[in-house]
Amino acid sequence: MVKHNGVLYRAAAAHAHIYPGKIAEKATENVGRFYDLPMAEVGLPHVLNEEGTAVGFDKFLVCSVATKVEQVGSINRFIAAKCEKYPKFVGLGAWHRDIEDVEKELNEIQALGLHGIKLHSDFQGFAIDDEKMLPVYKACMARDLPILFHMGDARSELSAPKKLANVLEKLPELKCIAAHLGGYQRWDEAKACLKGANVWVDTSSSLFVLNPDEARRSIEHFGMDKVMFGTDFPMWTHKKELERFFALGYGEEENRKMLYDNFEKLFKL
């Protein structure tokens, strides 16, 4: 548990990336280079577990991105193995636009005990509202599997908030997490076009840019029951992101929702 102003909170970090040891350092460096940001840690599973546990975290939502379709199976087996090794980990499956048998792949993801899928359209080279992805979204919706979408980047339209809004116009029951408070560098656009009963957001890679008033406007737009704390590990440490989160000045009830309760409810833990 984490402690703030004498109050103890259960805490889940709802956005973390992990990589196998042989590629972790290179993968971490590549992400830092893409965003032109220094990385606080290396994306190794044991580093996440140790660093987050030392701060008091109870759960970590872990994922990795497949940039090639042939990587999907091995990534998902890796994520599942690390979730078995580290009981605090809750895993999401990797996905790729070029997967041919959607139902078979989702069966395998669920058989591995994974709780949804992660998409990063900027890294994977497709728009969120690509027609080829609609059968995937429909299949996830039918299985009640959440999808974590990387959202936003001023340099790309592939992950623009409007792209997810286009999908939700067709599939309003799709359970989705719009990462980075709805859209990194595109927070105003996210507030303009994203909201709904099945839209969650996380706070990852947002609080280092937004001042507390700006962050609160985004949080209150989406609703206190739909916001989850996230770090974007290995980009930021849990300690630093917690400091930024508590600087928003919310009360005990709101903190409990965003730090753990919303995460627990979404993933049915």
Where are these predicted regions, by residue range?
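Histidine-centered divalent metal-coordination motifs
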Residues: 12-21, 120, 150, 180
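A general structural detector for well-ordered alpha-helical segments in enzyme core domains, enriched
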Residues: 47-51, 75-82, 105-109, 132-136, ...
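Mid-to-C-terminal alpha-helical segments outside catalytic/metal-binding sites
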Residues: 1-14, 24-59, 224-226, 238-269
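A generic "structured core" feature
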Residues: 10-19, 109, 136, 170, ...
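Conserved, mostly hydrophobic/aromatic
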Residues: 15, 52, 79, 109, ...
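Active-site gating/metal-coordination segments in enzymes
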Residues: 58-59, 67-148, 153, 209
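Catalytic pocket-lining loop regions of alpha/beta-barrel enzymes
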Residues: 115-116, 130-228
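Active-site environment of divalent metal-dependent phosphoester hydrolases
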Residues: 18-22, 67-70, 97-101, 124, ...
